[in-house]
């Protein structure tokens, strides 16, 4: 029965994942219950005078520490209950807990009610959720010589939300994208109270591999048989102050099978960006089988040595801001607007466009008879400043999005996802369908927007006003498929109009919600609202990079930049305050 109840809860959770919850923005992650380490000092312990209700609440807080198979939480159990309790698998994060008791002198039976706010997998993957906790089954407490103890409880882990926020922190692992051009974020939550153990924990997670849904979308240069020889230390071998000051970090591994220089560079990039983003500072001494990973970096690597893979760099930054004004593509030059040379500066009726991630090409949608029964759309692709070739057509086309391999992704007639490429043999345009069966079966409806992440391994879509995220997987036959779709940002409701990736971990959306017309949502599913001062609705298109968000409103294009937060609100983009103008960035 307990196994059936756990299955029921997991099925229920699968239906409600991607809800809205507030999660720490600075954070660190660990496979639950696998690491031997000191118990955090803020965790409660049972005491003889605890009332059953208090003891249960303190038990839920103690489950926040996964170390040694939840040893801290097991102190609240009788020996028989501890032996029977299966704490493996995902934890449910719960809040607003209510206990309903049936009491006798020596025994208390309890049923638990609570709100589900999310789940935490056994590898530290957090996803938001919303809904009521199904009845997990009875909880029984008995009086012992040491006070009340839990003698029966459901299998699985129920984790107190507030204690989760205090104990777990968010960090990001990085894996290589399939092209080897950049690294891909994989956010994790870990509970590490000793800062000097964090580097070892994060590298161990890299060695264990990406979250399951990313297994076929990224490469892991730290895959087995590679393993750590021992804990990560300071660069000089010291065991304290790792990654602080000028101490750096030293990673010693063994059983390295990677030989080519580019793969070794990617391996180093995975380690360096994972540690650097966790504020574990270099230099990073990386050794394999008793020798430096690269002789030229024997004294240590820095982030500059792997800058080409920097996950925070804006794609095609040199290309700058472009826009569609009166149906043609223009470029911004020192706050002056000039039509781009070539086809894209001449063609009328352009309704959506994107510059390639290299900044050298353009994909643009031309729509004739917009809104009419005979509306027709066509996709044109070519060099920025050059001529264009028609690459796809249909009754309607979504805003195009570029992948790292210079393919253009577009949705034809709201439900057919295509990759438009230049055929290597003939040089002619080729249209290759993308398998979107998994998306259509779980989230049926029109795909109104589709944008690829900067690393090309994820696709964010707007379906029915909701943000849907899917993995981009290349099959053995060389085809592409959208896999593992899930909803992000339940708190956004069904108000989303368009979206853009701000970073590899952060999406910004426009909404029909007049009070919150622009919002953010991250890969965990956590959403938050952007400032709305200075915005007029409705907003249509949106384009973003790590530093700036641009939106198309009734009066033209406006911008919000993190660098000018001392002056909150949105600012006009000079030259683009034209009704119908839409921002265009690489991506």
Swiss-Prot record:
Its main location: membrane. A lipid is attached at residue 20 (S-diacylglycerol cysteine). PROSITE patterns: PROKAR_LIPOPROTEIN (PS51257). It is found in: Cell membrane; Secreted, Cell wall. A lipid is attached at residue 20 (N-palmitoyl cysteine). Residues 1-19 form the signal peptide. Pfam families: Germane, Gmad1. SMART domains: Germane. Keywords: Cell membrane, Cell wall, Lipoprotein, Membrane, Palmitate, Secreted, Signal. The keyword Zinc-finger does not apply. It is a lipid-anchor. One of its GO terms (cellular component) is peptidoglycan-based cell wall. May modulate activity of the MtrAB system in controlling homeostasis of the cell wall and cell division. Partially restores antibiotic resistance to M.smegmatis in which this gene has been disrupted. Interacts with MtrB, probably extracytoplasmically. Belongs to the LpqB lipoprotein family. This is Lipoprotein LpqB.
């Amino acid at each position: 029965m307990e196994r059936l109840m756990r299955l029921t809860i997991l099925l229920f959770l699968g239906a409600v994942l991607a809800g809205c919850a507030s999660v720490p923005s600075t954070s660190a992650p660990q496979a639950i219950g696998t690491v031997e380490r000191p118990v955090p000092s803020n965790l409660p312990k049972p005491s003889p005078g605890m009332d059953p209700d208090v003891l249960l609440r303190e038990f839920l807080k103690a489950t926040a520490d996964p170390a040694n198979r939840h040893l801290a939480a097991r102190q609240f159990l009788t020996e028989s209950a501890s032996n029977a309790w299966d704490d493996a698998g995902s934890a449910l994060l719960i809040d607003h807990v209510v206990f309903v008791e049936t009491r006798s002198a020596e025994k208390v039976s309890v049923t638990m009610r609570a709100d589900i706010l999310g789940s935490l997998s056994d590898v530290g993957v957090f996803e938001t959720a919303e809904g009521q906790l199904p009845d997990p089954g009875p909880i029984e407490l008995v009086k012992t010589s040491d006070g009340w103890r839990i003698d029966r409880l459901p299998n699985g882990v129920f984790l107190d939300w507030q204690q989760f926020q205090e104990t777990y922190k968010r960090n990001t692992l990085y894996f290589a994208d399939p092209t080897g051009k950049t690294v891909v974020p994989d956010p994790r939550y870990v509970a590490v109270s000793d800062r000097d153990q964090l580097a070892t924990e994060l590298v161990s997670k890299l060695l264990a591999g990406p979250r399951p849904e990313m297994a076929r979308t990224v490469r892991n240069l730290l895959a087995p048989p590679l393993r750590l020889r021992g804990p990560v230390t300071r660069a000089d071998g010291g065991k304290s102050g790792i990654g602080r000051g000028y101490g750096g970090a030293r990673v010693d591994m063994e059983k390295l099978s990677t030989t080519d220089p580019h793969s070794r560079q990617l391996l180093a990039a995975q380690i360096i960006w994972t540690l650097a983003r966790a504020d574990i500072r270099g230099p990073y001494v990386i050794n394999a089988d008793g020798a430096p990973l690269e002789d030229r970096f024997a004294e240590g690597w820095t982030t500059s040595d792997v800058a080409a893979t920097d996950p925070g760099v804006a794609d095609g930054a040199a290309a700058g801001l472009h826009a569609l004004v009166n149906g043609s593509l223009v470029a911004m030059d020192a706050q002056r607007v000039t039509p781009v040379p070539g086809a894209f500066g001449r063609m009328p009726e352009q309704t959506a466009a994107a510059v390639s991630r290299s900044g050298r090409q353009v994909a643009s949608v031309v729509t004739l008879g917009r809104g009419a029964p005979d509306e027709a759309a066509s996709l044109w692709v070519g060099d920025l400043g050059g001529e264009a070739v028609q690459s796809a057509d249909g009754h309607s086309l979504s805003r195009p999005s570029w992948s790292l391999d210079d393919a253009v992704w577009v949705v034809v007639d709201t439900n057919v996802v295509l990759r438009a490429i230049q055929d290597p043999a003939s040089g002619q345009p080729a249209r290759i369908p993308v398998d979107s069966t998994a998306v259509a079966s779980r989230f049926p409806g029109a795909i109104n927007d589709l944008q690829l992440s900067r690393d090309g391994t994820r696709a964010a879509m707007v379906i029915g006003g909701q943000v849907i995220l899917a993995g981009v997987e290349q099959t053995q036959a060389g085809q592409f498929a959208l896999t593992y779709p899930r909803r992000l940002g339940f708190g956004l409701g069904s108000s989303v109009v368009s979206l853009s990736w701000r970073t590899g971990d952060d999406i910004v959306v426009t909404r029909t919600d007049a009070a919150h017309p622009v919002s953010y949502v991250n890969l965990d599913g956590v959403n938050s609202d952007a400032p709305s001062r200075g915005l007029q609705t409705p907003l249509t298109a949106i384009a973003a990079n790590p530093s700036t968000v641009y939106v198309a409103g009734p009066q033209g294009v406006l911008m919000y930049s993190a660098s000018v937060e001392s002056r909150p609100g949105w600012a006009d983009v000079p030259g683009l305050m034209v009704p119908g103008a839409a921002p265009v960035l690489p991506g």
